[in-house]
Amino acid sequence: MREIIHLQTGQCGNQVGCKFWETISGEHGIDQSGRYVGTSDNQLERVNVYYNEASSKKYVPRAVLIDLEPGTMDAVRQGPFGELFRPDNFVFGQSGAGNNWAKGHYTEGAELIDSVMDVVRKEAESSDCLQGFQITHSLGGGTGAGMGTLLLSKIREDFPDRMICTFSVVPSPKVSDTVVEPYNATLSIHQLVENADETFCIDNEALYDMCFRTLKLNNPGYGDLNHLVSLVMSGVTTCLRFPGQLNAYLRKLAVNMIPFPRLHFFVVGFAPLTAVGTQKFKTYSVSELTQQMFDSKNMMTACDPKKGRYLTVAAMFRGKISMKDVDEQMSMVQSKNSSLFVEWIPSNVKTAVCDIAPTGLEMSATFVGNTTSIQELFKRISDQFTVMFRRKAFLHWYTGEGMDEMEFSEAESNMNDLLSEYQQYQDATVEDAEEFLVN
């Protein structure tokens, strides 16, 4: 089987990761102790991608749980799915990173990284044919951002030909935990551009907006946000976990989605979004799902696709849906909004259909878009970074851990390059495209 090893790092990464395992265990009929209690052969056909079958007939996630302080790990162990994970795969320090990227990347994280890589290698050895890794982390803190990107570069070194995809939670000024988030995020994006193959960008601001606007929650907590993220993660990985046709492997998804290697940051969305408890009062058609899915209100990244252009799009539909309906609806969206799709990538929208609907829904659609409008997100972080960096505010926390100002300048200019690359391809025409191909 083509296995995927899942790594969750830092508090946010671990909380999002646990919600992901909760969601997909439900879909594969695996209970809290790892026993199979499902009813369909489809649930088990590709279960080995994410789970290892132990001799006791117990399914164990191929997951490594990492943090620089023990608190998060204790919470996972005491949570509903705490017994599911292999005890040896919890790797944690005692000191914490104090929201400092340099501590996660260069000092505290560097001390723990060898123990983490030992566990990763052990997991890789128990795989038949490893296809790659997925990492859940946030970009605003110390451990998920700093140590998460250190882990990324170590995996890239040790497994140069495997795919690495990240689910990265991007900080937002409206929902800010710490004042140095723009530094941590810019330094992380600098690493993601170079070392990740695919990055699904998830944005707290967009998640909060969804909770208020669509789900009508008055006081959403992290549990609500993580639930939304797990819906998207479950949708994005559907093709990897169940028998299907399109994008059945991480590499195939990348080949369809990434026209230029640096532009691998995706906007994700999910439909239907319904307030808790109202699902059972409504049924959806393929056309409604398609409409919702392309609506910026359903995007989990705070940028408006209408302000940019789609380079590529992948859509995963789930449930008892006819392929013909899906193709018709997707063609209609393209013809109605042709100006939003670049014309120099001819068949840039791909769709997949999986019979197995997510728990509690009759049908759903997950959206993955490679759109130039994601530069809004990077611009937001870059502007905040610049304001602080010009005054060298808070820099002593980073230089005190041995970092050099030069590294900040490099990260800043890499971010600016990324912005101008997105802009260049947004403005490009068919004639320009011929030049890109020649170069």
Curated annotation (Swiss-Prot):
Keyword line: Cytoplasm, Cytoskeleton, GTP-binding, Magnesium, Metal-binding, Microtubule, Nucleotide-binding
Subcellular location: Cytoplasm, Cytoskeleton
GO cellular component, one term: microtubule
Recorded superkingdom: Eukaryota
Residues involved in GTP binding: Q11, E69, S138, G142, T143, G144, N204, N226
Classification via PROSITE patterns: TUBULIN (PS00227), TUBULIN_B_AUTOREG (PS00228)
PANTHER family: TUBULIN
Description of how the protein assembles with itself and partners: Dimer of alpha and beta chains. A typical microtubule is a hollow water-filled tube with an outer diameter of 25 nm and an inner diameter of 15 nM. Alpha-beta heterodimers associate head-to-tail to form protofilaments running lengthwise along the microtubule wall with the beta-tubulin subunit facing the microtubule plus end conferring a structural polarity. Microtubules usually have 13 protofilaments but different protofilament numbers can be found in some organisms and specialized cells.
Protein name as it appears in the record: Tubulin beta chain
Native organism: Encephalitozoon intestinalis (Microsporidian parasite)
